[in-house]
């Protein structure tokens, strides 16, 4: 009998690009929109469009995945809150995926890179960065960190990716990988879904109540508006059952 692969719905809003993806079998469908200010308003309609295109409902989904961070405060909280709301409403588990992991997977897929450093603009003169090896799967060599651009110190020869290389081009110019870094690679729901399936299959998931953003700066409580987004997602999931 064929092995049935779990179906994952993924949400990623940690940067200026909002995206959602549905990974079902070997097929992946996605939606994306730019404009960080509209993420909370755009993501639920995109999710509903995606499910309608695939001809499925949340009842056909095995887990909700989200880009947990690091990234913009508002963005990672939006993704986490909406994932929680959908998971609560549909009684589904949640799979957090580190945004830098998703970038590294995209870099491997697009460039065949085996040793990767991801650098994401953290604003305020800082970057989020991490280093990975891809050998039969993605492994973190240096875990996600927040530092000044001068603190980015990958080990050995690496391929670079992320908008940190363009935002702090002068400060990072001394890195051998800087000149060829793919600055267009950003966190995306497609890779979030792909990594989440691996984690989910390995039993690495949490309840909606335990889902949290990954902050590398100080944690901030949810605002009233963000709680309303979460409630809207929960209501949408419940109405779709």
What are these regions (language model features)?
Residues 51, 196-204:
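Short, hydrophobic alpha-helical segments
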Residues 34-42, 73-77, 81, 98, ...:
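Residues at secondary-structure transition points
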Residues 1-4, 27, 38, 93-187, ...:
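Surface "functional belts" at beta-alpha junctions
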Residues 65-99:
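DPxDG-like acidic metal-binding loop motif
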Residues 2-68:
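N-terminal beta-alpha supersecondary unit
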Residues 205-209:
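Flexible, glycine/charged-enriched surface loops at secondary-structure junctions
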């Amino acid at each position: 009998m064929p092995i049935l692969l779990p179906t994952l719905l993924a949400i990623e809003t940690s940067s200026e690009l909002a995206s959602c993806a549905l990974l079902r079998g070997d097929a992946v469908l996605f939606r994306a929109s730019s404009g960080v200010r509209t993420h909370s308003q755009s993501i639920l309609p995109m999710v509903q469009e995606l499910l309608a295109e695939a001809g499925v409902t949340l009842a056909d989904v095995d887990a909700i995945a989200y880009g947990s961070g690091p990234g913009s405060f508002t963005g990672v909280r939006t993704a986490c809150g909406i994932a929680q709301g959908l998971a609560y409403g549909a009684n589904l588990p949640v799979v957090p995926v580190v945004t830098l992991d998703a970038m590294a997977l995209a870099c491997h897929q697009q460039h065949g890179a085996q040793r990767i450093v991801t650098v994401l603009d953290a604003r305020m003169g800082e970057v989020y960065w991490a280093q990975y090896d891809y050998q039969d799967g993605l492994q973190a060599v240096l875990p996600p960190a927040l530092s000044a651009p001068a603190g980015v110190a990958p080990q050995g020869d690496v391929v670079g990716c992320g908008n940190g290389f363009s935002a702090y081009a002068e400060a990072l110019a001394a890195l051998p990988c800087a000149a060829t870094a793919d600055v267009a690679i950003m966190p995306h729901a497609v890779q979030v879904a792909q990594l989440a399936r691996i984690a989910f299959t390995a039993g690495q998931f949490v309840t909606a109540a335990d889902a949290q953003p990954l902050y590398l700066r100080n944690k901030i409580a949810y605002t009233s508006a963000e709680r309303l987004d979460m409630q809207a997602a929960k209501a949408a999931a419940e109405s779709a059952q």
